[in-house]
């Protein structure tokens, strides 16, 4: 299933993505806002100061240690996720696929140096390939909307006749439950802001909105019709990958589109 030469699109030359910094540059100069940052504007931010103080008092340790513990977990999750995406891209390019990641964190309170195995995730990816024997149209495709000045990266897109399907790789314990169903309800009753106030504040719904915004960008700027969108979850707490079809969320896309200029000006 190795992908051949990338299908060239005249828009590709204008956008550059730097994954470590998570920065998109338009024509090497103007910075575009990642779609994930756009979505976060429509949900209440986590009050890390309040909750770290609460947890520190509970455990009788410093607030700084709590914040570092959270920061190290977040850094590990992001770094391993980025690494997994790179390895999947290597597979499609015919390059060696590594199954172990070296994570280091050296803070004031937290010091971590460990090897993290992605053997289970790799096996799940191979199982996905066995069940989806098609050649991708594009992988790791940076796309953008130059009017809204937003950009994002599609993990894999498949051409099926005259339409396309989007696939998004995820490595997370917070998207599906033990039975493989999406975690679609926030346990604390928290929801989105404004007209998104009926959408539960969970990673699952954040990713669903993200895929719908990718669909919007592609259909508006690339003359591509998106038929299906999927989240594909690889995780070390199960032997099987999980494939979730993403629902169309036209109202959410319309609202985020209309509010984008106003909201992003505050970033």
What are these regions (language model features)?
Residues 1-83:
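Charged, glycine-rich intrinsically disordered N-terminal tails and low-complexity linkers that flank
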Residues 4-6, 72-73, 77-196:
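Catalytic cores of nuclease domains that cleave nucleic-acid phosphodiester backbones
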Residues 90, 94, 217-221, 263-266:
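Active-site catalytic microenvironments for nucleophilic, acid-base chemistry
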Residues 143, 234, 260:
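Hydrophobic pocket-lining residues within nucleotide cofactor-binding pockets
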Residues 199-230:
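Metal-dependent nuclease catalytic cores in nucleic-acid-processing enzymes
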Residues 223-246:
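Substrate-binding beta-hairpin/strand module that engages nucleic acids
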Residues 256-263:
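Conserved small/polar residues in nucleotide/adenosyl-binding loops
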């Amino acid at each position: 299933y190795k992908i051949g030469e990338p299908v060239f699109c005249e828009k590709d030359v204008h956008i550059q993505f730097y994954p470590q910094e998570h920065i998109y540059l338009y024509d090497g100069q103007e910075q575009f806002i990642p779609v994930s940052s756009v979505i976060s504007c429509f949900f209440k931010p986590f009050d890390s100061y309040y909750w770290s103080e609460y947890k520190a008092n509970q455990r009788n340790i410093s607030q700084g240690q709590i914040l570092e513990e959270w920061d190290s977990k977040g850094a590990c999750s992001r770094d391993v996720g980025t690494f997994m995406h790179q390895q999947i891209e290597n597979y499609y390019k015919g390059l060696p696929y590594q199954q172990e990641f070296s994570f280091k964190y050296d803070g004031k309170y937290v010091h971590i140096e460990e090897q993290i195995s992605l053997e289970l995730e790799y096996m799940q990816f191979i199982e996905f390939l066995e069940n989806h024997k098609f050649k991708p149209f594009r992988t790791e495709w940076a796309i953008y909307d130059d009017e809204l000045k937003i950009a994002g990266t599609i993990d894999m897109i498949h051409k099926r006749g005259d339409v396309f399907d989007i696939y998004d790789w995820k490595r997370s314990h917070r998207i599906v439950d033990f039975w493989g169903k999406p975690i679609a309800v926030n346990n604390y009753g928290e929801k989105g802001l404004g007209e998104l106030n009926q959408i539960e504040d969970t990673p699952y719904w954040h990713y669903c909105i993200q895929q719908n915004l990718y669909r919007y960008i592609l259909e508006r700027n690339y003359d591509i019709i998106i038929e299906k969108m999927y989240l594909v979850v690889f995780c070390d707490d199960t032997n099987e990958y999980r494939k979730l079809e993403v629902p169309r969320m036209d109202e959410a896309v319309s609202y985020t589109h209309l509010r984008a200029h106003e909201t992003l000006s505050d970033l």
